[in-house]
Amino acid sequence: FFNCADEKGNYYTPKSADSFEFKVDQFADLAILRYQIPGWEELTLKEKELVYYLTQAGLAGRDIIWDQKYRYNLEIRSALENIYRNFSGDRNSDEWNAFEVYIKRVWFSNGIHHHYSNDKMKPGFSKEYFDSLLASSNTALEGNPYNVIFNDVDSKMVDKRKGVDNVLESAVNFYGPNITMDDVTKFYSSKTQPDPTKPLSYGLNSKL
């Protein structure tokens, strides 16, 4: 966030709009864009420091969102990122390229479910290749967090279809596994509001 000099003592000069590269990356159905911040250099050091800490607060809250969206998201992300940092094999193969696309989609969606459709995203690489990445990068991922990448379990983060149990069929982590709509209805119907003008939020700290 600060205007740092390079090894030669040359300070960064913001590029003009004509020379600025807005597109950072493009993969799957996504294009990643960045933007200039006009007036950034005119901010005081205190104002820049405030922006820094606001950004850090956002990063701290990010993991809450990941966990709320799906119970295995954080464990899966940790494994994928460890592979991405430590894999020393061929990074030009088709399967590695497929792995890169997958981890970028997971980053963008804050989890393994698509940010619009809520469908679980399928990897373009084989289970055997993923096993080789885990082994060669000394990464551990086992049990349900491993299996769910490749199987059809928890295929929808939020399932809004009619005629199904929307709570049971949704993988979102607001409720524990195997909780049904009937469980939710009974839970809330048993609660009372002592003062209707000051309603209590019973569900904030409960996964039933």
Question: Which residue stretches match the model-derived regions?
Answer:
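N-terminal helix-rich structural modules
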Residues: 11-208
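C-terminal motif of bacterial Sec signal peptides marking the signal peptidase cleavage site
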Residues: 2-5
